[in-house]
Amino acid sequence: MASGILVNVKEEVTCPICLELLTQPLSLDCGHSFCQACLTANHKKSMLDKGESSCPVCRISYQPENIRPNRHVANIVEKLREVKLSPEGQKVDHCAHHGEKLLLFCQEDGKVICWLCERSQEHRGHHTFLTEEVAREYQVKLQAALEMLRQKQQEAEELEADIREEKASWKTQIQYDKTNVLADFEQLRDILDWEESNELQNLEKEEEDILKSLTKSETEMVQQTQSVRELISDLERRLQGSVMELLQGVDGVIKRMENVTLKKPETFPKNQRRVFRAPDLKGMLEVFRELTDVRRYWVDVTVAPNNISCAVISEDMRQVSSPKPQIIYGARGTRYQTFMNFNYCTGILGSQSITSGKHYWEVDVSKKSAWILGVCAGFQPDAMCNIEKNENYQPKYGYWVIGLEEGVKCSAFQDGSFHTPSAPFIVPLSVIICPDRVGVFLDYEACTVSFFNITNHGSLIYKFSHCSFSQPVFPYLNPRKCGVPMTLCSPSS
């Protein structure tokens, strides 16, 4: 009955315009009351439409100066706001064990209890509070948690959309790559069948691995989003329900909320991928044919030991390495390591003297950070150890060689310029893949020396033309200061 009376009172103090409890109520001469903001907006609209102000309920005209604040109604509204009108607000739950009202909250157990529960063994010694005292505190916490989770939900949905876009992009990209590979290899089918198969397998493996990982990430993102949605629904239900529903198990909900972390999906940078490209198919075909042709002249090369070179030679005369550095003791017993005259004292010739014809051999330089190789004419070992650095490595002195420094700098040595004739002209060589194995082809009659990168499908590294072979020439190897050996490969390898 009391509830019905309160409902009737609420209707009397409800604004006819916004249908909410009156805020700063103003009354007209006709007796109707409105919110100050609502009446002000209605007055402006009436003046624009009709040129006069009238009551929104009974349409009786009024003068703005006759409007008066209704403090009596304002007091009624204030009292009414303190009373809960909903059936849930008037409802008092009772303890299932004792039948008493549930008016206490146990902090340790996170439960709503009655006064008899408080005195029971289960809750004895626990910290208990009136539900009304702690409800507001937890409501603020849960409201903040709700806002945070809504933000995380938005972030999760954005991550989910990003991963789907990433997945589609990768699928399109790899499909595009596969199409290009197929088109490229169509023109090189006779020679490059194995290359095509290898590249497609790599792409398919890459597609499988990446899409598998992205699919897994997508599933995790969906589960992550769903988990956040479920927690949000739980919080909304608690916030909209009764005090008991708000507080029952609230600590567990807060712990779940605090443990919510958004895991970002794994992505794969496209700019770091290695994808097969064949920009010059005709040139590639010529390279393959040239390498196939010169390998018909493969000769079995070994080195020739001498008393001048300090290079270390294997028993089968195929492997050459630099010796260990000498230890020199200076003043006060200081120890120094030295590689005196290493550039030329570690150089050594092949045993074969070449005076005509075509000759090809290969040298394994894998894992070496420095080396020099090629051909040498008119070798004079007595003079070599007296020349420092790279000054002797010039065609005019009988050297047609290329070399590697610091593991990445590949160069060819040409004759010095007019201004610096004693120093060789260093030609930087652009190699996409640093060679682990180098092929050397000497055409005595054509006066050419060519170098091939066997590691990169036999591509041409450099070619010396118009060579002056006025005397016999020999294969030349120099392991330099790098302790890793260089090996002459047999034709059967």
Swiss-Prot record:
TM ranges: none
Zinc finger (B box-type): 90-132
Modified residues (Phosphoserine): S86
SUPFAM superfamilies (UniProt xref): B-box zinc-binding domain (SSF57845), Concanavalin A-like lectins/glucanases (SSF49899), RING/U-box (SSF57850)
GO molecular function per UniProt: pattern recognition receptor activity; protein homodimerization activity; protein kinase binding; transcription coactivator activity; ubiquitin protein ligase activity; ubiquitin-protein transferase activity; zinc ion binding
UniProt-annotated binding residues for Zn(2+): C95, H98, C117, H123
Catalytic activity from the UniProt record: S-ubiquitinyl-[E2 ubiquitin-conjugating enzyme]-L-cysteine + [acceptor protein]-L-lysine = [E2 ubiquitin-conjugating enzyme]-L-cysteine + N(6)-ubiquitinyl-[acceptor protein]-L-lysine
Pfam families found in the cross-reference section: SPRY, zf-B_box, zf-RING_UBOX
Example of a GO biological process term: host-mediated suppression of symbiont invasion
Enzyme Commission (EC) number: 2.3.2.27
Top-level class of the enzyme under EC nomenclature: transferase
Domain B30.2/SPRY: 281-493
Keywords tagged on the record: Acetylation, Antiviral defense, Autophagy, Coiled coil, Cytoplasm, Immunity, Innate immunity, Metal-binding, Nucleus, Phosphoprotein, Transferase, Ubl conjugation, Ubl conjugation pathway, Zinc, Zinc-finger
Start and end residues of each stretch annotated as Required for interaction with GABARAP and for autophagy: 185-198
Residue numbers of N-acetylalanine PTMs: A2
Posttranslational modification: Degraded in a proteasome-independent fashion in the absence of viral infection but in a proteasome-dependent fashion following exposure to restriction sensitive virus.
Subcellular location: Cytoplasm; Nucleus
UniProt domain comment: The B box-type zinc finger domain and the coiled-coil domain contribute to the higher and low order multimerization respectively which is essential for restriction activity. The coiled coil domain is important for higher order multimerization by promoting the initial dimerization.
Record's function text: Capsid-specific restriction factor that prevents infection from non-host-adapted retroviruses. Blocks viral replication early in the life cycle, after viral entry but before reverse transcription. In addition to acting as a capsid-specific restriction factor, also acts as a pattern recognition receptor that activates innate immune signaling in response to the retroviral capsid lattice.
Family (UniProt): Belongs to the TRIM/RBCC family.
Subunit and partners: Can form homodimers and homotrimers. In addition to lower-order dimerization, also exhibits a higher-order multimerization and both low- and high-order multimerizations are essential for its restriction activity. Interacts with BTBD1 and BTBD2. Interacts with PSMC4, PSMC5, PSMD7 and HSPA8/HSC70. Interacts (via B30.2/SPRY domain) with HSPA1A/B. Interacts with PSMC2, MAP3K7/TAK1, TAB2 and TAB3. Interacts with SQSTM1. Interacts with TRIM6 and TRIM34. Interacts with ULK1 (phosphorylated form), GABARAP, GABARAPL1, GABARAPL2, MAP1LC3A, MAP1LC3C and BECN1.
Protein's name in the database: Tripartite motif-containing protein 5
Species, as recorded: Pan troglodytes (Chimpanzee)
